[in-house]
């Protein structure tokens, strides 16, 4: 029965993408399937409020699928998404994103504590166009996201609670020219106690004279401010970059010994090269 449902969902996705492509100009079409190589570098705080930065630079090959109902591999921000309901100005979907692990040996406040494992977050989101639309040069978007978090250590998975994450994003298409897009985003985050404990909790066995035991509380985590630019260099090559500021002040866990600073900064630079695309074309959603 489950296999039948999967087949039906994939069939509906293929049917929807075919119908969607019929009314789209050729220059706005991309392959339904593709293979990309992304070379990216980022320098972010190791965790919210950490004074230690996590620098990551990797080349990653990965497949891309641009289905109308289900898609994956189109952006580093969101690994995969599934559309539950979609109109020109409103959609309900399920999203999946992840964070890199970090060794506590490299973190001044967490030295001697368990590592911060690979963190996967998934859940529903409601996206609304408050002003403009996908065909306009300017668009104001509101996204309301709920994510369930799971940390993964080898084959062990541990539930890490939930987050609520509203996002307000302003898109400027055709910035300077038709190949450049500018975006501004404000995104506060609230988390349950299981989520905040992952970053700020200190079990008694890891307590020291300078790091007392601490039970993390649910509540406000921080707010992210982002300025990003996407630049299409050629049909196969695209640059995406962003700078970010995190405001941690006012966090529900400011008194944690693992809370280190009120502000954080970050940068991400990425080059996306499309190595291959299928002959079947669909409307671009990148």
Predicted feature residues:
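Outer-membrane beta-barrel translocator domains and adjoining extracellular loop/strand segments
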Residues: 25, 48-53, 104-110, 153-160, ...
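Transmembrane beta-strands of outer-membrane beta-barrel proteins
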Residues: 36-42, 75, 93-97, 141-147, ...
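Residues on the lipid-exposed face of transmembrane beta-strands in outer-membrane beta-barrel proteins
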Residues: 39-43, 59-65, 78-83, 122-130, ...
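Sequence/structural signature of outer-membrane beta-barrel proteins
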Residues: 42-48, 99-105, 129-133, 147-155, ...
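Outer-membrane beta-barrel "beta-signal"
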Residues: 58-60, 262-286
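Outer-membrane beta-barrel transmembrane domain signature
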Residues: 156-238, 247-251, 258
